[in-house]
Amino acid sequence: MNAPTPIHSPTHDNVHFQRSELSVILSLYGRFVAAGEWRDYGISALRDVAVFSVFRRTAEQPMFRIEKRPKMAAKQGLYCVIGMDGRILRRGSDLKTDLRVLERKLIRSVN
């Protein structure tokens, strides 16, 4: 008797952060942790977006999200920094430049 052959759906690679991108993000994260502003983070790799979420406490909703959306690279930029209220703080194609919007908040909190 022949066993039925399962039909495999095409595999889709999830979007993820490269090592160099994570290095830039974690460097900023470390500075905020040292300042006592951030305490936890989460990384999600989904089909069309990679998300780095920053939390003040583990059980809360994220304070900020750094998203990588390859489909938006040509239109509005590969990276997006989103605030707690869902507002887009910065969009662009250079991660270091886009994260400056958060570095300004670090300078304010230290002063």
Predicted regions located by residue number:
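Short aromatic-glycine-(Arg/Gly/Cys) micro-motifs in beta-strand/loop hairpins
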Residues: 2-3, 65-86
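Negatively charged, low-complexity tracts enriched in Asp/Glu with abundant Ser/Thr
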Residues: 2-51
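Short, charged, intrinsically disordered terminal tails
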Residues: 6, 11-14, 100-111
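Acidic surface patches and DE-rich sequence motifs
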Residues: 9, 46, 56-58, 83
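Short, charged/polar surface micro-motifs in flexible loops or helix N-caps
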Residues: 47-50, 57-62, 72
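General beta-strand recognition
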Residues: 51-53, 80
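Short, hydrophobic/aromatic-rich beta-strand segments within well-structured domains
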Residues: 53-54, 67
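Mixed-charge, glycine-accented linear interaction segment located at domain edges/termini
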Residues: 80-109
